From Swiss-Prot:
Job description of the protein: Poly(A) polymerase that creates the 3'-poly(A) tail of specific pre-mRNAs. In addition to polyadenylation, it is also required for the 3'-end cleavage of pre-mRNAs: binds to the 3'UTR of targeted pre-mRNAs and promotes the recruitment and assembly of the CPSF complex on the 3'UTR of pre-mRNAs. In addition to adenylyltransferase activity, also has uridylyltransferase activity. However, the ATP ratio is higher than UTP in cells, suggesting that it functions primarily as a poly(A) polymerase.
KA1: region residues: 544-787
Cofactor descriptive note: Binds 1 divalent cation per subunit.
PROSITE patterns attached to this UniProt entry: RRM (PS50102), ZINC_FINGER_C2H2_1 (PS00028)
Source organism per UniProt: Danio rerio
GO BP, one annotated term: snRNA processing
Main location: nucleus
Signal peptide: none
Gene (name only): tut1
Entry-linked SUPFAM superfamilies: Nucleotidyltransferase, PAP/OAS1 substrate-binding domain, RNA-binding domain, RBD
A GO molecular-function annotation: zinc ion binding
Protein name stated in the entry: Speckle targeted PIP5K1A-regulated poly(A) polymerase
UniProt GO cellular component terms: mRNA cleavage and polyadenylation specificity factor complex; nuclear speck; nucleolus
Catalytic reactions of this protein: RNA(n) + UTP = RNA(n)-3'-uridine ribonucleotide + diphosphate; RNA(n) + ATP = RNA(n)-3'-adenine ribonucleotide + diphosphate
Length: 797
């Protein structure tokens, strides 16, 4: 057996540099290189290498630039498979193409511009393949052996007991809390010397009752009293002439800065100096004054702690007290949060900052648990508005003009009438979110129920216009940043705490909830195994196995393509219409998607309609016409239903098939149920292999076209030209491909999306599977691009 580059010979046998394991002899080595772990890492390394070769590094764009805008721009150079934004937002992005040749085409362009700014585009940095050390990750996370925990869980007699054991394994111990308290006292003493009357206030996981081993120590340096002290000192014109040298050195730090006028960056630099020079054991001090939330980071050697100090984070302190209150109101909250956090970490949904892509943070996950408990019947926890009404006058609180009022003590809140145990509630959590329509919903802990996405679709400017001019809370009028998952902070109501997530993470969370819900229905979850097998939480915490992953390709046999609802990527005019439509928004959006899908088939791919699109709408039998005002003048989107319901007639290519008429009427007249629109049906024919060789044709067109850097119609125009070139140059199919497409909008008890189901009716040449495979990625992206560009097209017309 010839050794490959990953295998190194040692005195005691062999060492696999890829898997970081020692192997005693050659037979064991042969087994190792054929094993699942080694083969998996080989595939993963090859995949990472391909991703690097097919990607470019992009910077220089505006901070509010969306993934959709970047994707649309770079689509003109090749098929974009993914756009990964940096976690701080607005600094850089990685644009991944389907082929490395597309990267060369992109880099060959002398200049790239987007939204008036010149982009910096360069090849993606090639990094040596390395798996993050588990030990390094664990020091920032749970620092427990899952094998050891599983052993303890299997000894438990019930799921309820297992959940309590999870809490005991993960929670901060009393000695850890005491160590943190001592460090807070030390910092208080030191900073009081320099900032008289200041306060060091701990917040976050260390004190919110959900702390984990080795979690960071978050601190808020409150300087309000110090500002008053400094103002008094100036007014009395006190001097330091009679002070000792040591006192003068300390006072000189404060005298060098006016806290009332100093910038946060200046104050943070001063905080960093004090930490470096005056606090024993502190090292690795770093002031991050340009971050979204300016902070000073530090480490303490002897205590093995990492800490953050902020100077303007009162809302976070109030959030911490809110979580403390919720834990005190009902003792079931803490065990559920610890269990669900560990489950989410094991499924790579949350907690692991080195994981793939943006993940749920622990705060967002905790709010999801609280919201679920607010929606039990009867509720386990009250809404924030209900808590506000239970507070007394002395407990009223407003921070940065946000109402943060709630009782200071749990005994002010009546106990819940809900008697469900932890086992049932955990099952209920997965059931609740497995059926949750994340794209069309906004989670509101303040209201205690879901808010429709249409309430947030108006632009900030429109919201400001409609806001009460006399309102003392202008921040309420600004809208939260919408995304695939929308979870409002209970107090800062324009902050989406899950705004960092992308569609992939939201889908993964929903999928894992569905899998967990199925498992929790089984006896393996509910009853202890009499044969000593894994049961209950042990199997629930198991990472997704390769066997489970291998079962996913079966779903590919279902000929379906989905277009997800992405309100953030829609043009402003359409967002305003959807907002006005309220609960009927799905019908309007469905019409837009169908119009875009028709344009992809009819204009971009040059498919021909063979019979009129038929709808099963409940219209008057004598005939009807449905008009939907969308205040836009898109070409070829005028679609009309006339004549008797169910009748068909041949259509010319120019007319195109459809069900709806989207006109420029000034008022809406709806003759069908837009809240639950009926399915649409198309039948198309295709006489050319328009899916074959598109990348090569696109590259050739970019090389020969004078408009390569700025195609007039963007990627939509370019894809149309690619199709036309294929139709003109390539041999046509001997027998035309004919296929049916059924379009249906779903939502409510599942994520809002348009599902397109395909049925090949004539496929003599056996090419439909290739065509469908091409459409799986091409059709949703092009439809979303067309809808996202609609406003620009209107402006140009």
């Amino acid at each position: 057996m010839e050794l490959d580059k990953d295998i190194q010979t040692t005195q005691k046998g062999f060492h696999c540099n890829l898997c970081h394991v020692n192997i005693p002899n050659r037979p064991s080595l042969e087994d190792h290189v054929k094993g699942k772990k080694h083969l998996h890492l080989l595939r993963l390394r090859a995949q990472r290498k391909t991703q690097e070769e097919n990607s470019v590094f992009v910077s220089g764009f505006k901070a509010d630039t969306s993934q959709t805008e970047l994707k649309e721009y770079f689509q003109q150079f090749g098929l974009v498979t993914d756009v990964i934004m940096d976690k701080q937002k607005g600094v850089y992005a990685i644009v991944e193409f389907s082929e490395s040749q597309d990267v060369q085409t992109t880099l060959a362009q002398p200049q790239h511009q987007l939204n008036g700014l010149k982009l910096r585009v360069k090849p993606r940095e090639k990094k040596e393949f390395k798996l993050a050390s588990r030990g390094k990750q664990d020091c920032k996370n749970t620092l427990i052996s899952l094998d050891k925990l599983n052993f303890e869980l299997c000894k438990a007699m019930s799921v309820n007991e297992q959940i309590q054991k999870v809490v005991e394994s993960l929670e901060l111990k009393d000695n850890e809390k005491k160590v943190r308290d001592l460090l807070v006292q030390l910092l208080q003493e030191v900073f009081t010397e320099f900032f008289p009357d200041c306060q060091i206030v701990p917040f976050g996981s260390s004190v919110n009752t959900f702390g984990l081993h080795s979690c960071d120590l978050d601190l808020f340096l409150d300087l309000e009293n110090t500002k008053v002290f400094q103002a008094r000192a100036k007014s009395s014109e006190q001097t330091g002439e009679n002070q000792s040298e040591d006192c003068r050195s300390e006072d000189s730090i404060l005298s060098d800065i006016d806290l009332s006028t100093a910038s946060p960056a200046e104050i943070l630099e001063l905080v960093a100096v004090i930490l470096r020079k005056c606090v024993p054991g502190v090292h690795k001090v770093q002031a991050l004054s340009t971050a979204r939330l300016p902070v000073v980071k530090f480490s303490h050697k002897e205590l093995n702690l990492q800490g953050d100090i902020t100077i303007n984070n009162r809302l976070a302190v109030r959030n911490t007290k809110f979580l403390q209150l919720c834990s005190g109101i009902d003792s079931r909250l803490r065990p559920l949060v610890y269990t669900i956090r560990l489950w989410a970490k094991q499924k790579q949904l949350a907690g692991n900052l080195s994981g793939p892509g943006p993940l749920l943070n622990n705060y967002a996950l905790t709010l999801l648990v609280i919201f679920f408990l607010q929606n039990r019947d009867p509720p386990v926890l009250p809404s924030v508005n209900q808590l506000k009404n239970m507070a007394c006058e002395e407990e009223e609180c407003a921070i940065e003009e946000w109402d943060c009022t709630f009782p200071s003590q749990p005994f002010s809140v009546p106990p819940s009438k809900n008697t469900e145990d932890l086992c049932t509630l955990l099952f209920g959590f997965f059931t609740f979110y497995s059926k949750f329509d994340f794209p069309a919903s906004v989670v509101s802990l303040r209201d205690g129920h879901v808010l429709p996405i249409t309430d947030f679709l108006k632009s900030d400017m429109e919201a400001l216009k409609t806001a009460d001019a006399s309102s003392p809370k202008p921040k309420r009028s600004s809208a939260p940043r919408l995304g695939p998952m929308n979870v409002l902070d209970p107090f800062e109501l324009n902050h989406n705490v899950a705004g960092n997530l992308n569609e992939r993470t939201q889908k993964n969370f929903k999928r894992e909830c569905c899998e967990a819900e199925k498992y929790c229905r089984s006896l393996q979850y509910q009853r202890k195994s009499a044969k000593g097998k894994s049961w209950g939480l042990v199997r629930l915490f198991a990472p997704q196995s390769e066997a489970a992953a291998s079962s996913q390709p079966r779903a590919e046999k279902v000929l379906e393509v989905s277009v997800p609802f992405k309100p953030a990527s829609l043009p402003e005019s359409l967002r305003a219409q959807l907002a006005s439509a309220g609960k009927d928004f799905r019908g309007l959006w469905f019409a837009e998607v169908c119009s875009a899908v028709q344009k992809v088939f009819n204009e971009i791919l040059q498919c021909s309609p063979t019979e009129e699109t038929q709808s099963l709408d409940k219209t008057d039998k004598s005939g009807s016409e449905m008009e939907v005002n969308n205040n836009r003048s898109l070409e070829d989107t005028n679609i009309q239903v006339k004549g008797e319901a169910g009748k068909k007639r041949p259509l010319s290519v120019e007319e195109g098939p459809s069900t709806f008429t989207i006109t420029q009427a000034k008022r809406q007249r709806l003759d069908v149920d837009l809240e639950h629109p009926e399915p649409l049906h198309w039948t198309w024919t295709q006489r050319s292999r328009v899916w074959a060789g598109r990348r090569k044709v696109r590259r050739d067109l970019l090389k020969t076209s004078d408009e390569a850097s700025k195609p007039e119609g963007g990627c939509v125009d370019m894809e149309s030209r690619v199709t036309q070139s294929i139709v003109e140059k390539e041999e046509k199919l001997h027998d035309a491909l004919e296929f049916k497409v059924d379009a249906e909008v779903v939502g409510g008890n599942e994520s809002t999306k348009v599902v397109l189901r395909f049925h090949p009716s004539i496929d003599t040449a056996g090419v439909f599977q290739d065509f469908f495979h091409f459409l799986e990625s091409f059709l949703p992206k092009m439809a979303e691009t067309i809808m996202g560009r609609a406003e620009d097209i209107t402006d140009m017309s």
